[in-house]
Amino acid sequence: GKVYLVGGPELGGWKLQSDPRAYALWSARQQFKTTDVLWFNFTTGEDSVAEVWREEAYHACDIKDPIRLEPGGPDRFTLLTPGSHFICTKDQKFVACVPGR
């Protein structure tokens, strides 16, 4: 699949942005497919990234029971299934929507 630098060069990697919608706006412009890879460029100890199960956990960025949580960076997530992948940490969040077959 294609490798996506999350946020693209314009956001400078996975870090807090002045606009909390920055990553959601970036994600809305992408056309993700299964086997695509999300590359989160951040430094270990400065950030983390989580994929959560439900939209409610996403909106609250509740990472107590994540699908996966990566405290060390940089990191990559492969989009293995169609559907909505809810990604968040702190005020950084977006949904990676992967169309079905």
From Swiss-Prot:
Recorded superkingdom: Eukaryota
Record GO terms (molecular function): electron transfer activity
Keyword flag Cell wall biogenesis/degradation: no
Keyword Disulfide bond listed: yes
Disulfide bonds: 61-88
Post-translational modification: The identity of the saccharide is not reported. The sugar attached to Ser-84 is represented simply as Hex. Cys-97 sulfhydryl group is modified but does not form an interchain disulfide bond.
Protein name: Pollen allergen Amb a 3
Organism of provenance: Ambrosia artemisiifolia var. elatior
